[in-house]
Amino acid sequence: MLNVDGVEHEVSLDATLLEVLRGELGCTQVKDGCSPQGQCGCCTVLVDGVARVSCVTPVRRVVGRSITTAAGIDPDLSDRIVTAFEATGGSQCGFCTPGIVARLVGLARRGTPTETQVRTALGAHLCRCTGFQPIVEAALLALDPIQPLPERRNPAAAEARATLESGRPQVGGADVVLGAFRFAADSAPSGTKVAVAQSTGGYSVASTEAEAAAASGKVQGRNSTIAVRPPLPIPMVEGAVISLATSFVEPAYVEPDASWCAEGGDPASPFANAGAFGAKRTSTVSADARRLADELGEPILAIWPREEVVARGAKRPPLSLSIRADGSGRLTVATTEGSEDLAPLLDAVAEIAPGLEASIVEVPGPKVGATHRGAVVSEVLAALAARGLAPGDPATVVAPNGARATVSIDPSNGTVKVDVDAGDPICAITLRSYVIGAVHQGLGMVRSEGIAVDEMGVVQDLTIRSFGILTATQTPSVVVEVIDASGPAVACGVAVMAATMAAAWATAGHPPTWPTA
């Protein structure tokens, strides 16, 4: 017997705890972001009060023990956690949040945690949205029983700002924080057959995800020993004052591509509660779900395992550039076979840097996308802003939409200071959360993010931890000043990300390749 959130269940013993929770018991508040890698933390639950990653926990080891999901925690503590997350903007898309909540509840058993303890505990989790700091702030509020809680943010205002930033409808609240919100893989009707993507390009279909995954011949993700390297040489430009070459970067949205569809119906959107930084817009998973449902004559849930998300999904386009002091120079953007047209990116660059001679060159590699947040434009804005910057100098960027960000990094302690003008804030709490998330991604772009691609263009880094995303302990403190402007609200992401990249690059001494690590 297995006790889950206070209820006894008879379950299969030849399975992982995650397979039982989701597949047999319908506990969709436990999310699957990378199974069975055990690296994203989305499937974390409490086993006798101790946080465990359920995708790598055999059920046999926990029979007779008490399993608690985010939905089963003490109601008073649950309410404090939701209030704290809403007060700090600690959840955006929310896919990672229920697992983090479980981790934090387990941490609280040892007493009121410190910031260092919270950040260390979050080392088991990936949050691509918030940059971790709003989560840390929420934890320190919620887990200190004598700490008064601030008011929750206005739901309508928060939704409006979040939707503007993510480019897709996004909601918040208790359902998102505690996992009741249903993402695409959670919303398929009971009994829907599951199609798991194969590395050969097809799908294996079975009654359960576990059976389909086993039939797919899925190869466990791996970390490569191949170095991350830019695929393009830096262009030779006489008089250039700054040069750069970047690598393939995995967007690393935490919710894998998934969609379900009934025969003759419309497929569920893989954008359940966020925009995935624009990176899912080329995903075929919805079309695949519709095709399979029509071919098989029944509802089908199509899922890409994490390894297939990496292998099939579009990457941020690599580029190389050299720029003179007057803004003239050369820019080369890499495309690959099967990628979408990148010409619109060159048109966008021409608007912000008319002196750049830009071209597109095909190289071996995974597909790249034109719709990733600020792709190419952010890097060019960062390079223009970084000219002449010394460590600690503020970098200011005005994005094409009019958003303005000024970012400085204290060389003595790494603290990041951001002043942001995104028009009407609508909800300053939500805007601040998105600012910190953009800082996190901008720092990662310069310092650590990139994936290894072999000479044939095949991605070799297929695990969450191989993408180079900064962890909670690696992410510095971010101080945000939101300028309460009266103009129309605009998204802050490109401006903040580009200004952060410029400041981080200057702090590192303008090395010619990213990532610098």
Segments from the language model and where they lie:
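Signature of N-terminal electron-transfer/Fe-S-associated modules in redox systems
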Residues: 1-159, 224-226
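Cofactor-binding beta-sheet edge motifs in enzyme active sites
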Residues: 2-3, 8-15, 28, 35, ...
